[in-house]
Amino acid sequence: MPKKRSGGGLSPTQQAAKFLGVSVLAGAVLAGIALPAVGALGLAAKGSVESFDELPANMKTPPLSQRTTILDADGGKIATVYSRDRTVVPLKDVSPYMQKAIVAIEDSRFYQHGAVDLKGVLRALNKNARSGEVAQGASTLTQQYVKNVFVEEAGDDPTKVAQATQQTIGRKIRELKYAIQVEEELGKKKILENYLNITFFGQQAYGVEAAAQRYFSKSAKDLNVQEAALLAGIVQSPSRYDPVNDEAEATKRRNIVLQRMAEVGDISRAQAAEAMKAPLGLKVSKPKNGCITAVKGAGFFCDYVRQVFLTDPVFGKTKEERAKVWNQGGLTVRTTLDPQAQKSAQRSIKEHVYKSDEVATAATIVQPGTGKILAMGQSRPYGVDIKNGETTLNLSVNDDMGGGMGYQPGSTFKPIVAAAALEDGMPANKVYSSPYQMAYPSPVSACDGKRWVNDSGNPAKLENENSSEVGPYDMKEATAKSVNTYYVQMISDIGICPVTTMAKKMGVERADGDKMPQVPSIALGTQEVSPLTMANGYATFASRGMYCTPVAIESVSQRVGDRKKSLEVPKSTCSRAMSEKTADTINTLLKGVVEDGTGSKAGLGSRPSAGKTGTTDERYAAWFVGYTPNMAGAVWVGDPAHKRKMSGITIGGQSYGKVFGGEVPGPIWRVMMSGALEGKPVEQFNDVHIPDGINRDRDKNRDDDRGDEDDNDNGGFIGGLVGGNNNGGGGGEPLPAPSFSIPEGFFRGQDNGGGNGNGGRFG
């Protein structure tokens, strides 16, 4: 008796014997059924033992693509995403009626024949010959399973799908050989199980479990006889027998299956007759896929998780490898999203900014010391229906993660300047003259021994909120009131490099990925950043100087067949950005902003909090970024298109003459954080005593009627960088024109052979 080869295949003699029979049968199938114009020996004439033997001995079976479930930190479902809606189930969890129905209609002799059914071939050949067309196929269930494996392997590549389904001799040869292998290795029960899990049932449902849920909103194990017959009938032509779109045609097909089940003895004729009278009984669950299905307004966070998966090398070295894992699915992704914090964020957003408003808001909360993203939401809902205000642009994140180009943070950047100064040795009670108006200082030192020089010929002047805001000021008062001239004098004193270096240590970088330019205007928040960046940057203060990279994923498991395996996930990396003393000092300064400064409307009552307001040039955006020791959050309000100024505007049903960081974003932050922190421990800051730098009384009432700090109630730039009427001008008054021209490139700078900065150059 010939022996098997060491590789597990048959000997050449055995292969030749099998191939002889297979060739004749396949020739009959292909030539007489699939290609009636070709002679019955067409395949045999083109085939040979050698070509059959050249095929790989083992068929590679790719893991079946399945749905992926994204969970919040408590295990609650956020969304279900998939490339193919499929849930793999064992045969024991499939109704016996379903098992019998699919065998009866697709391959009634399944348990009697091998990989090829000779009787079936001859029967189909005879019927097709009499009808003159392809009326009946002869592929066994095993052969159909093999073909479906090739289709699954092709994925969404149309060329590969066409190759997997094309009616050619080569494909039939390959299909037949692998059918023989599958029969020998798996056995009938496993083949049936695999077939039921891989087959397409229409309506985006792959596999019997997804089909049962789609058409009947129940599990496959609970299907009754008429439901099973309907699903089994769909397989031959999912579009033709689609019960949702053609109930009559689907009913006819179902009844054919029931009749066939009675003919082979699976059910009695009486059962079949009764089942044929029953209505289809559809209870359709509409296909739901992707982050659009996310609950609690977490669609943007869901999309951020997807972006992390597709971009982080931990999930694969190449973009293609990562996409393959994601599209294969079967993943359970446990995220960092805190359901309480997310619910609170969305509630506050909905209360304060309507989705139909001319401007939008985005809010993000992170956990200091871990980098975990706890909440992420915005006023414009996730979706593709632009006419109804939906968008897929994530306003909270950087451009490379599905966001935009960012927004100028205004005076919320000033604490970073203060941190750099303190780290550089500046005392916390440092006093600057801080005049109401001053020329922009020049030169200012930059990195690598360079200097920024303003040689525009028309030096810009900057000014404070109003003419009564005149120094000297120390750091505490200047921070609480966000005095522009104080912070410009500060960066001019310490130089630009320590500030850009500190920003980088805190993870505060431009949303478009460009480097932070070496220009002194960064002290006033001119470089576009995202809310997630600012929230996580301020979390560095809350964690006493430790910066942690943001993370959204806690764990990932993947089901492959009957096994579950854990995947490695990105970890937050933490590093010290500043000393504890510096962080504690900043916390003390920013507590003053909330307690007795421009951010008083954002205060959390008895719970210690700190933060900073900010409003950008021309009021295109307003911010509040704040934190407690256990949560940090950022709220941005503005026009993503950078076209609508927030003067004379209605937001959330309320009219505003001019919008300030403490007036709209501040209350959003307060409500959001109050709900997110409810029930959480009340933690204290490590306060630092900061002695007064000036030993004289200040007129504390002179700015009682100010709307915001830095935010230049005269409609000027960057909290008073460019002046105008500042005597508490009414919101309905026209904005005055600047009293001087602005040097070209003042805010973003230029780079013409070394020139870079506020209309200046490096020397």
Predicted regions located by residue number:
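Soluble, non-transmembrane domains of envelope/secretory-pathway proteins that act on or interact
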Residues: 1-6, 440-462, 609-610, 614-763
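N-terminal type II signal-anchor transmembrane helix
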Residues: 1-69
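Extracytoplasmic/periplasmic proteins that interact with beta-lactams or build/remodel peptidoglycan
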Residues: 51, 57-67, 72, 136-144, ...
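Peptidoglycan glycan-strand catalytic modules in the bacterial/periplasmic cell-wall system
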Residues: 64-266, 480-483, 492-495
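Active-site SXXK
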Residues: 100-103, 107, 261, 345, ...
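Bacterial peptidoglycan biogenesis and beta-lactam-recognition machinery
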Residues: 106-117, 131-137, 182-188, 200-205, ...
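Conserved catalytic neighborhood of penicillin-recognizing serine enzymes
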Residues: 130-155, 289-293, 426-499, 561-592
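A penicillin-recognizing enzyme superfamily signal
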Residues: 335-355, 363-365, 376-378, 384-408, ...
